A protein has these predicted regions:
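Alpha-helical scaffold elements that line and support the substrate/ligand-binding pocket
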Residues: 80, 98-121, 146, 186-187, ...
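Bacterial Sec-dependent N-terminal signal peptides
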Residues: 19-53
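Catalytic-site signature segments of enzymes, centered on catalytic residues
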Residues: 85-87, 93-94, 158-246, 263-277
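Active-site-proximal loop and beta-strand segments within enzyme catalytic domains
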Residues: 68-70, 91-201
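Active-site helix/loop module of the DD-peptidase/beta-lactamase fold
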Residues: 114-158, 211, 215-259
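Penicillin-binding protein/beta-lactamase superfamily catalytic region
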Residues: 222-223, 242-318, 327-332, 337-339
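A short, well-structured edge-of-sheet supersecondary motif
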Residues: 59-92, 96-98, 105, 322, ...
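Short, gly/Ser/Thr-rich active-site loops of penicillin-recognizing serine hydrolases
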Residues: 362-388
């Protein structure tokens, strides 16, 4: 195991929020103020460190006992920065992985940022037919319905009958992002439902949300990701492509990523640990990357509102990008088909991301089960112990 523990200070904006009365704008004095008293004439004790050793051991034990995975790694953050990074097996901190559905939270972040841009004409509650230059049977659905899996458009359960909708999983240069979107909007799928009536995870609805955003902004999807997340957060690797047509062509480097011209919105992103850590921090800092606010607190909160659990058919607690835990209140996660998963504990103020780079899907549920049943409870106990 290779492990590194780093604690970064709060950004100046967050120090301002924490020190409202004192102020952060300077005061014309060159004197360094004395640290605040702890009530007994001394200075405050240093903030206790969280002990990640039990979580590290659980990851190592998992790797030792599972014949499928050669490596696993994870990072934990809070509002102040990266708290802990650990790598196991053949992983390093620079390992780049395909995220599959762990792309969903960053995809929604991009949509929400576009919706909050005063210079853009995009509304997550506006029917997509009012934006797209073509009409179709699903024109009355909204982006909010699309990325909460409540649009009524059949999800991945109907993949076998997707037919022309499979264009969304191709890296063929002849298939354009917008042209595929027109197919998705205009070709009805079997077992379609009214918007807002059923929870049906994944698939064409997510691609339509991305196409609508691109058309509204007159930009490619990756241009939007770079504008609203990549540049302000200083992301080095994170981007979207589309490897689903042939996963074997991925060699673990960003240069091998195909399908950037027809990116898969729900499951096409790649990342390293550091980039995803920065994205998770946005959810803990009130929407900030460093000193730049990329999302409002309201947008962050809206992503966690249960939309999937309030429909009439097949209800499942789900926000926009986040699965909402039934058994662990205040916990949200975004697992992917290969085993990677991101998660957040709203009450305790931490979030994490676990990277997997085995794409056989032989035992892809195992890392997600590990995180949900062992790792998150261990981290919660560690944070609680540090707070006592």
């Amino acid at each position: 195991m290779r492990t590194a523990v780093t604690r970064y200070p709060l950004s100046p904006l967050w120090l301002c929020a924490a020190l409202l009365v004192s102020g952060c704008g300077g005061g014309g004095s060159d004197n360094t103020p004395a640290p605040p008293s702890n009530g007994s004439g001394g200075t405050p004790a240093p903030e206790p460190e969280v002990d990640f050793s039990e979580a590290d051991t659980a990851f190592q034990n998992f790797l030792n006992s599972n014949a499928v995975f050669d490596g696993i790694s994870y990072v934990v953050v809070d509002a102040g920065g990266t708290l802990h990074t650990a790598t196991f097996g053949d992983h390093s901190e620079d390992t780049v992985v395909m995220l599959a559905s762990t792309s969903k939270v960053p995809a929604v972040m991009t949509l929400m940022a576009l919706a909050e841009d005063a210079d853009a004409s995009f509304d997550i509650n506006q029917p997509i037919g009012e934006v797209l230059p073509f009409d179709g049977v699903y024109a009355d659905r909204t982006p909010a319905q699309l990325v909460s899996n409540t649009s009524g458009i059949p999800g991945l359960r109907q993949l076998a009958v997707y037919g022309p909708h499979l264009c969304q999983y191709s890296f063929d240069d002849a298939i354009s992002f917008e042209a595929c979107g027109e197919v998705l909007l205009s070709v009805p799928l079997p077992d379609s439902h009214d918007a807002g009536s059923i929870f049906d995870y994944g698939g064409s609805q997510w691609q339509l949300a991305g196409v609508t955003a691109s058309v509204a902004a007159n930009a490619t999807w990756n241009q939007l990701v770079d504008q609203y997340l990549g540049a302000p957060c200083g992301l080095e690797v994170f981007t979207f492509g589309n490897m689903w047509e042939d996963l074997t062509q991925w060699d673990g480097t960003a240069g091998s990523l195909k399908g950037r011209g027809n990116p898969n919105i729900e499951g096409g992103a790649i990342t390293n640990l550091a980039d995803y850590a920065k994205l998770l921090q946005v959810h803990l800092t009130g929407g900030y990357c460093g000193e730049t606010q990329v999302l409002s607190e309201a947008a962050i909160a809206e992503m966690r509102v249960d939309r999937g659990g309030v429909v009439a058919e097949e209800p499942v607690p789900y926000g926009m990008g986040w699965w909402i835990s039934r058994d662990n209140p205040g916990v949200y996660d975004d697992p992917g088909a290969f085993g990677s998963v991101s998660f957040m504990d709203e009450e305790r103020g931490f979030a994490g991301y676990v990277a997997i780079d085995d794409y056989t899907r032989i035992d892809a549920d195992a890392p997600v089960r590990l995180v949900r049943t062992e790792i998150i409870p261990l981290l919660q106990a560690a944070f609680d112990a540090a707070a006592d």
